[in-house]
């Protein structure tokens, strides 16, 4: 992977990630949003439909794909790209977040994490080395190191111990990644909870090890938005300018805008797809909750500013009807729209940065959705 930074506007950055794959060279324009394909699919969508929304890179889930279908099936197909028939770039998380979310079902040691398989109950073990091996078999274009996602709230002492162990695991991840001869990209993950001095130590340690990009982890886990914004504003200027920056698991449209304001290049979140299945649709002036009875006789399109397949062909009344009847098509049309909305938002952000008017765009964005602009 090669990252090229083309332009900055304030702290906002406009760049390109270039990937050489067997099918040719692929580019990902940044800032970028990655739809989430947890089990090797963006729920309810074919790869072609996802691509039409504007997506250039997807996120796959190492933990879930390891448990089911497993490494052997993946190897038999070639890799995750072949398995799901998406031949553009894929980023996979390390499995750490899912393991640590198991709570009492897991035990953390220096070697890794022992936990109970949520599918069949057997005891299994995941380590930095094992995570690198799984992601190698997945053929991930961007591999994430194995780390501990520090919970919130956390005491300073706990956050410090967690961050220090994550650094040791980062080094082990790097070493196993290199031993495997993996020629793809490996990203480090900055931890340290809401403590700036711990974040600084994490950054210094990761830069010393050396990675192709840097993610900001341990945010969007329950902390106040002000803390997330503060940590991003503190962390991003200390990261290498020539490497992409990735805010993990974020988020709402406003979170994407605020992340870009503070120097983030990449995002992922299940929100557009999960919310779509629950009738919660993102539009230019805010949100449409399509299950509301007021849409029963609404013959207008979902969003007059949107040119997605759903908005070009169907009315709110039809989407309301599909949802009420429990029709699968309703969830699919909603998903097409929400994914398109996110990709259109990122395209608007990129254009605003190119034209040196990103802050004007931010003001207009918040004005449309009826909210005030957060302070930096």
Swiss-Prot record:
The keyword Transmembrane does not apply. The keyword Glycosyltransferase applies. InterPro entries: ArchSynthase1/Queuine_TRR, TGT, TGT-like_sf, tRNA_ribo_trans-like. Binds 1 zinc ion per subunit. Its EC number is 2.4.2.29. The active site is at 93 (proton acceptor), 268 (nucleophile). Substrate binds at residues 93-97, 147, 191, 218. GO terms for molecular function: metal ion binding; tRNA-guanosine(34) queuine transglycosylase activity. GO terms for cellular component: cytosol. It comes from the Bacteria. It is an enzyme of class 2 (transferase). Its cofactor is Zn(2+). Zn(2+) binds at residues 306, 308, 311, 337. Catalyzes the base-exchange of a guanine (G) residue with the queuine precursor 7-aminomethyl-7-deazaguanine (PreQ1) at position 34 (anticodon wobble position) in tRNAs with GU(N) anticodons (tRNA-Asp, -Asn, -His and -Tyr). Catalysis occurs through a double-displacement mechanism. The nucleophile active site attacks the C1' of nucleotide 34 to detach the guanine base from the RNA, forming a covalent enzyme-RNA intermediate. The proton acceptor active site deprotonates the incoming PreQ1, allowing a nucleophilic attack on the C1' of the ribose to form the product. Belongs to the queuine tRNA-ribosyltransferase family. This is Queuine tRNA-ribosyltransferase. It comes from Histophilus somni (strain 129Pt).
